[in-house]
Amino acid sequence: MSLPLPSFLSSNNYNSSETSLLTEGPESDEEDEGPLLKQYRLKNMLGYGACSTVYLAVDVSTNIEYAIKEFKKTSLRRREKFRLMQLEKELGSFNDMDSSTIEDQIRNQEKKDPYYYIRKELDVLKVLDHENVVKLYQVINSDYKDSLCMVLNYCPGGKLASVDHGISFDPMPLETCRKSFRQLVLAVNYIHGKGVIHRDIKPDNILFKENNNLCVIDFGLAEFLPKDGFVKPASGTPAFMAPELFDNELKKIKGKPLDIWSMGVTLYVIAFAEFPFNGSTILDMINVIKGKSLMIPAYCNSDLRKLLERCLEKNPEKRITIEELLRDPFLTERGKHHLTSSSIVTAFSSIWEI
């Protein structure tokens, strides 16, 4: 199983030579104003990844701010070509002559469905509507820029934590960890209830909204669960990937426990400002995830310790379920609180207003 270099150990695969909406969008009708995309005025870049760039934008008719995620079709075509070539190689039917055939196949699919490259992500986002999950408002096919753009809700509070380039923050207070993880559990419980798994839960994919609610973002690796609940192994961010994903003998694995493991790593990272399983190289880190026992600092709260041990159980059959998380002693404070959206919002806001 081949794994890409995780983003927190390498630079992003961003090609700055490709034009962006901000640098070369339709001309502004006013000086010192950003370019327009439909009714959205682009203000500044918020971030970027391998195939996308995210901008802050404002709807000129309502003055409401949004995040616009732009996908360059040239990058998407390269990614899709690589995926199809890998698939052909696995089937043993690829040869050098197939490259142009694959390109034609991709172009034909694009003509049939302009949103072909991000169809899976769009289909997932369309079924999700929850206060702790990113909301999709509009999709724009920009022929002018050869781009596909998602208009999403803007989260001005920033990330839960940034670990893509290493950890450089202090451990979060116990109550902050509790309130944060409560909302993450509510979000994932909803997502799983819709028959979806996220597959890339990590602090960088969890943002704060204006009201201090958490918002799970980036469903680029998400997928709908088959009826049997099993999925094929796939790449993600290695530090947050469950050990069963590194077992080459497994052709299919249970989907929901993958998200639970990633949630456990996320909780550990914000609680202790370090990874539960780490290594100097990717291979070293994978071996640690697969074989090393979980080590938790001695000062850890006893209920938090038990929760982490259950989330980071290497056997997915024994790993805590999302239903059990809703009743967990650490999150409910031993039954004092029920995990419901309304109760969590009030409690969480008070913590962050101290």
Swiss-Prot record:
GO terms for biological process, alphabetical: cellular response to calcium ion; negative regulation of calcineurin-mediated signaling; negative regulation of TORC1 signaling; signal transduction
The active site is formed by D200
Report the superkingdom from the record: Eukaryota
**UniProt GO MF annotations:** ATP binding; protein serine kinase activity; protein serine/threonine kinase activity
> Quick one: which residues bind ATP?
L46, G47, Y48, G49, A50, C51, S52, T53, V54, K69
Enzyme type, top EC level: transferase
Q: What is its main location?
A: cytoplasm
InterPro entries per the UniProt record, alphabetical:
Kinase-like_dom_sf (IPR011009), Prot_kinase_dom (IPR000719), Ser/Thr_kinase_AS (IPR008271)
Cite the CDD domains for this sequence: STKc_LKB1_CaMKK (cd14008)
* Chemical reaction(s) catalysed: L-seryl-[protein] + ATP = O-phospho-L-seryl-[protein] + ADP + H(+); L-threonyl-[protein] + ATP = O-phospho-L-threonyl-[protein] + ADP + H(+)
| Compartment(s) of residence | Cytoplasm; Nucleus
> What Pfam families does the record point to?
Pkinase
Q: Does the keyword Membrane apply?
A: no
The record's GO CC annotations read: cytosol; nucleus
Which SUPFAM superfamilies does its entry note?
Protein kinase-like (PK-like)
State the family it belongs to.
Belongs to the protein kinase superfamily. Ser/Thr protein kinase family.
Q: What is this protein called?
A: Serine/threonine-protein kinase ppk34
